[in-house]
Design a protein with these regions (language model features):
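A contiguous active-site-proximal alpha/beta segment in oxidoreductase catalytic domains
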Residues: 99-158
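N-terminal Rossmann-like dinucleotide-binding module
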Residues: 1-48
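Active-site loop of classical SDR/Rossmann-like NAD(P)-dependent oxidoreductases
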Residues: 16, 36, 226, 266-279, ...
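Contiguous beta-strand/loop segments that form the cofactor/metal-binding neighborhood of enzyme cores
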Residues: 171-250, 275-289, 308-310, 322-345
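Beta-loop-alpha module in the N-terminal Rossmann-like domain of NAD(P)-dependent dehydrogenases
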Residues: 17, 37, 48-111
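Glycine- and charged-residue-rich phosphate/anionic-cofactor binding loop of Rossmann-like
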Residues: 29, 284-302
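Hydrophobic residues in well-ordered beta-strands that form the structural core
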Residues: 14, 54, 71, 94, ...
Length: 345
């Protein structure tokens, strides 16, 4: 039997998720396309053959013929829609962030704990990227010795004029926060963020984080790199390293030059990760066995707590502690990072 999915939000991410579900995920049925923009929803619904097209998300997630909800609406709606979907008995995959603030994320966690079962997952798709997977396996297999540090950079082509350094930390960097925590298996304990002033565009933000396991993580977020979308990472161990480079799709040789082209945004780079994540989500629902790589609501909270500390650090220029609340029993046990190293009391 197919898992009947309602996709809420038909912007860039929502439309991509809907296409992935219809073309690349056996066992998924696109039951509802929902967006406040009815024209856009109808165009996508007709294109993909959705059974229903709606403009009211609460109507979409409360339907008896919907088993699961994929939320890709504006960030400010995520918490309320996730809670409503849970209370309607649905499974949820929510694009990051699960909520814009830790307080709203706690509301989601409290609602899920009242249910007594995990129904919420967060779209940290890099956990399914084959390159990051190889990096994590190399560390766990002891191929590079003990993990010492991770270097990261996250570069986008351009950002709007209103995009701030605080937004770079809260909107862009959470992918690095999550994947480094996932690979290292250790919680963050402190962070410092710096940014040089810029006259013409938002300047890069640089973050350094310390983990409970004694590792250092650094992250460059540059949202005006101009040349293309580029994400790279290096895991440094005591006896070696693992280097995640930009994938080369094609190299053009002409006029005495060799040119490598970069993607314009993140979707081509992480196409496999999105596809594998969505497959894992649907398979977990249909088989009743969750893929341990899927990020849960607690993982969503952890990324937001780091981001909030990072924003304070950027504003004050000082190291900031990262909050580390006790993990509820619901989020302990069978998961990929169940052995996370946590700060000492």
């Amino acid at each position: 039997m197919s898992v009947r999915v309602a996709v809420i939000g038909t912007g860039v991410m929502g439309a991509d998720h809907a296409r992935i579900l219809t073309s690349d995920v056996p066992g998924a049925a696109l039951q509802v396309i929902c967006d406040a923009n009815g024209t856009r929803a109808r165009e996508l619904g007709d294109q993909l053959g959705a059974a229903h097209v709606l403009t009211d998300p609460l109507e979409a997630l409360s339907r008896a013929d919907v088993d699961a909800v994929l939320i890709a609406s504006p960030d400010s709606t995520h918490a309320d829609l996730t809670i409503a979907a849970m209370e309607a008995g649905k499974h949820v995959l929510c694009e990051k962030p699960l909520a814009p603030t830790s307080q709203d994320t706690q509301r989601v966690i409290e609602a899920e704990n009242r249910l007594g079962e995990r129904r919420v997952h967060v779209g940290f798709m890099r956990r399914f990227d084959p390159a990051y997977g190889a990096m994590k396996s190399a560390m766990e297999d002891g191929l590079v010795g003990d993990a010492l540090m991770m270097h990261n950079f996250h570069r986008n082509v351009t950002a709007p004029e209103w995009f701030t350094g605080e937004m770079a930390i809260s909107n862009s960097a959470p992918h690095e926060f999550d994947i480094c925590r996932f690979v290292l298996g250790s919680e963050y304990v402190s962070v410092i963020a710096v940014q040089m002033p810029s006259k013409n565009a938002i300047a890069p933000v640089f973050l350094v984080l310390k983990t409970a396991g004694g590792q250092i993580v650094n992250i460059e977020v540059n949202n005006n790199a101009a040349y293309g979308y580029d994400v790279r990472c290096e895991l440094v161990g005591s006896t070696g390293s693992v280097d995640l480079k930009a994938p080369v799709h094609a190299t053009y040789n002409a006029s005495l030059k060799s040119v490598q082209r970069f993607d314009a945004d993140w979707r081509p780079r992480f196409a496999d990760a999105y596809r594998l994540q969505n497959k894992a989500w649907i398979n977990g629902i249909s088989r009743g066995a969750t893929d341990p790589r899927l990020a849960n609501a607690w993982d969503g909270l952890c990324s937001i707590l780091v981001a909030e500390a990072g924003v304070v650090s950027l504003q004050t220029g000082t190291w900031q502690p990262v909050s580390s609340p006790d993990v509820p029993a619901l989020y302990q046990g069978a998961k990929a990072n169940s052995s996370l190293i946590v700060p000492a009391e």
